[in-house]
């Protein structure tokens, strides 16, 4: 018998989808958490507990999954890019918008005009929308500063968001996102003057959990990203990469050679790149919001990824220009409908594999003893409903680190 205390919470009368490979739904399930950590997940018949002093929550037969993980966002920014949306409707491509001075650079001015506190306030409505759909963990990238201070302010805002909302924030340093106008044609100088010293400062301030980059014809070359990743390696910071979104430069293969946590987008990934990712354990992060928003026609090679044994995560890619999306539930539906991911691939892609893509699978992403008690409790009969519905939020309540934080 487990001795209970007021620090123990017990969820009874539940059905549990643990998101563990090969595991089935546990009916008539019980979840026990102590001091925010899971101590039991399984059938009620397998547990004996003295619950006189514990808080017991009757789930009414609802389905419980791990709290969702959005593993790729640019959610901290100022302004919007609705005008570019109109440009694309009139026929301009993503590359044409970027080469005309729009795209990422156009968000920089609006973002750098805000203080850290103002960035937090601007981002909260977007963050709150994701949390309302069961998200417990959120990755946030810099990339709209393009100066040392601008990049670090975005990361400071990301850290601050974790203090004002019940959410786990994982940060990525993305100074190698674009070059500002004053460095046009001088990528090497920008890397030397901004990217590398900014990484040093961010690392010293404990603002950086991973280093990211945009490897593409309109951004940085493979060799330029190697320079950035070599510096991250010296500092002991994990890396990840936006790769093969608009063309195949071999970025995913290069990232895999550094043991990258993930390579993201991947519409133009080839078999060689997929095999390199599989060998390195690099997760493929699929981003249907960007594919949809820029009216892309080339889909990521899902079957090639499956055949190679690459694990797949999905994410919103929430950003002001190419994926103004704040619904991980809709992202699941897009992944299934546009890219033919299975229900299991979608749900595990927004939980287990998303946590793996952030390097935090030991903390969250599945419902297993020892992990954080991050739960999403749903008013649904079967898991497929999370993927099947469009524009409907069936969340009943959210639990973060063992505490109910929203209904």
Curated annotation (Swiss-Prot):
InterPro entries in the record: Amidohydro-rel (IPR006680), HutI (IPR005920), Metal-dep_hydrolase_composite (IPR011059), Metal_Hydrolase (IPR032466)
Positions with a binding annotation for N-formimidoyl-L-glutamate: 144, 319, 321
Biological role: Catalyzes the hydrolytic cleavage of the carbon-nitrogen bond in imidazolone-5-propanoate to yield N-formimidoyl-L-glutamate. It is the third step in the universal histidine degradation pathway.
Residues at which 4-imidazolone-5-propanoate binds: 81, 144, 177, 245, 322
Subcellular location: Cytoplasm
Cofactor(s), by name: Zn(2+); Fe(3+)
Species: Rhizobium rhizogenes (Agrobacterium rhizogenes)
Protein name as it appears in the record: Imidazolonepropionase
Pfam families recorded: Amidohydro_1
A molecular function (GO) term: zinc ion binding
This protein's GO CC annotations: cytoplasm
Superkingdom of origin organism: Bacteria
Entry EC no(s): 3.5.2.7
